Amino acid sequence: ANAEIARKIIDHAGLSDRIHVVLGTLGNGGQTLDHLESVCGLSAGGLDFIFIDHAKDAYLPDLRLILEKGWLHPGSIVVADNIRVPGAPEYRAYMKKQEGKLWRSKEHKTFAEYQSIIPDIVLESYYLNN
């Protein structure tokens, strides 16, 4: 249902030729990765922006798959939601360790979805490819 709503919004905005809604996970044995390459035409350096907001323990493994594919280019932006609540500690630690080497990141303080009193973090990262 969410994917269909997203497609309608994208179509209404006139961006259907530039944005693909893909159902699946990157860690499903290559099926989604293959789809992104063969159907969507994704190739080396082809991603300008990624928004990560799914299973928190998959943030880092999925980012690593994207890096292995070479889909990012210097200046690609990755935004990860809910870094603090419920949390993606491995992803956050990786970005801190790679600061100034592979990534330049900034933490944006926000609040958990539907909970305006619970602090959360959105992590914005710029790919340096150093």
State what each model feature region is.
Residues R18-H20, G46-D48, P74-I77, W103:
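Residue-level recognition of the N-termini of beta-strands and the immediately preceding loop/turn
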Residues N2-G46, D57:
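S-adenosyl-L-methionine
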